[in-house]
Design a protein with these regions (language model features):
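Short, solvent-exposed loop/turn elements at beta->coil junctions and helix N-caps
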Residues: 71, 139-143, 170-172, 216-220
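Short, surface-exposed charged micro-motifs
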Residues: 152-154
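A short, Trp-centered hydrophobic/proline-enriched beta-strand micro-motif
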Residues: 130-139, 183
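Short glycine/proline-enriched turns and hinge-like loops at secondary-structure junctions
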Residues: 76-78, 146-149, 174-179, 194-197, ...
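Alpha-helical interface subdomain recognition
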Residues: 1-92, 101, 114-119, 126-131, ...
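N-terminal glycine-rich flavin-associated loop
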Residues: 98-118, 147
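A short core secondary-structure module
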Residues: 160-161, 165-213
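Flexible, small-/acidic-enriched active-site or ligand-binding loops
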Residues: 150, 208-237
Length: 416
């Protein structure tokens, strides 16, 4: 099992790291400072200029669409891409600059893997080119979304059209004017078996009946310009051919989508933790109290050591999960994905929280990125499945294995 940086990805990783440090980081603060109070989800002229210039430079340098692994994508495997995702996690803008930001990556993977040729032509091509953005409508306000089969939004076939009614919330990116299409999880057959009731349908955002109700704040922050929207769909009519893969395949598609996405999220989280540790060390060495640098006070050196050890453990677990995704079945990888989805956000939260504490009051202000980083990681404990559900998956699997092995041992003694 080789989890190291391969010869293929090593030079690419260095180029990505250099691009982020030399091109992205110097303008990131300016981009954030430009967010408009009156209309935070619309990019200002200066933000458009910054982002457009960075994306053009990245595309011309071949630093583009890394996430689409395998022969038809970047040629990277999941382990190799994981190292790039970690670097992107150190910057607020980097993932979008390289056209590797959620939810577009997951949507592009869905269209690449399951979409028809017409769907790929209409939506995948402009997404891969970075010309448009997209959103994914799954979570709903009226039901517990920790159960991925728990969908109320309905789609009824009337002639050659699907008629969609329902509400979605936490629809990330839906308020961005660049967002042109939603992949919407709907219920098409309430009488079918539980995992065959759902379908996924492409809904252009300018379709009559698609209404942005309001943005949802995260710890009273809008998370602009990306944002998370509540969306109402009232008698939304789209062509029959907008369904992806076919009726009843929605749950199957969502599982294929969420697995790689969770690995990407976790590696970016490790990048965030690395950035927080860097800021923590900077503060601990430059700031003095009682005549001594902070790292020489109390148990602060232990905090720094624990952060490094916890990051390394989480990285190794995530890389092994990426390896499982490359070399085993999705069913086998599923348990490992649940492990990292539980371990990594909680690890990152602890490191970021320790960095906040080391900074004192300024750590919770807008003068450092730490408060926003903490908010993002706390949200990730809920996004793509709450960690309580992932713990349940891991625990149940452990009991299942124990009982199977215990049964084999008992049978051996009984028969022997």
């Amino acid at each position: 099992m080789d989890l190291g940086i391969s010869e293929k990805v090593a030079p690419l990783l260095e180029r990505v790291r250099s691009f982020i440090n030399e091109q992205v980081m110097p303008v990131e603060h300016e981009f954030v400072a430009e967010i408009e109070v009156d209309d935070p989800f619309v990019l200002t002229d200066r933000q458009t200029e910054i982002l457009g210039s960075l994306k053009n430079q990245a595309r011309e340098a071949g630093l583009w669409n890394f996430f689409l692994t395998g022969e038809k994508g970047s040629g990277l495997n999941t382990v190799e891409y994981a190292y790039l995702a970690e670097e992107m996690g150190k910057s607020r803008l980097a993932a979008e600059v390289f056209n590797c930001s959620a939810p577009d990556t997951g949507n592009m993977e869905v269209l690449h893997k399951y979409g028809s040729e017409a769907q790929k032509k209409q939506w995948l091509e402009p997404l891969l080119a970075g010309e448009i953005r997209s959103c994914f409508g799954m979570t709903e306000p009226a039901v517990a979304s920790s159960d991925a089969t728990n969908i109320c939004t309905s789609a009824t076939l009337e002639g050659d059209e699907w008629v969609i009614n329902g509400e979605k919330h936490w629809t990330s990116g839906a308020g961005d004017p660049r967002c042109k299409v939603m992949i919407c999880m709907v219920k098409t057959d309430p009488e079918a078996p539980k995992h065959l009731q759902q379908s996924q349908i492409l809904v252009p955002m300018d379709t009559p009946g698609v209404n942005i109700v309001r943005p949802l704040k995260v710890f009273n922050m809008l998370d602009a310009p990306h944002g998370h929207m509540r969306v109402k769909l009232e008698n939304v009519r789209v062509p029959k051919d907008n369904i992806i893969l076919g009726p009843g395949r929605g749950f199957e598609i969502s599982q294929g989508r969420l697995g790689p996405g969770r690995i990407h999220h976790c590696m970016r989280s490790i990048g965030s933790a690395e950035k927080a540790l860097e800021l923590l060390c900077e503060r601990a060495t430059e700031r003095e109290a009682f005549g001594r640098p902070l790292y020489k006070l109390g148990g602060n050196i232990d905090i720094i050591a624990d952060a490094r050890m916890n990051i390394e453990q989480a990285r190794l677990l995530t890389l092994k999960t990426a390896w499982m995704m490359d070399h085993t079945s999705p069913k086998e990888a599923r348990i490992w994905i649940s492990m990292i989805k539980t371990v990594v956000p909680n690890m990152a939260l602890k490191v970021i929280d320790d960095a906040i504490q080391m900074h004192g009051g300024i750590g919770v202000s807008q003068d450092t990125p730490l408060a926003e980083m903490w908010s993002g990681q706390r949200t990730l404990r809920l996004a793509d499945g709450p960690d309580a559900v992932h713990r349940m998956v891991v625990g149940r699997n452990e009991i299942k294995q124990y009982l199977a092995e215990a049964g084999e041992v008992a049978a051996t003694f009984r028969d022997g």
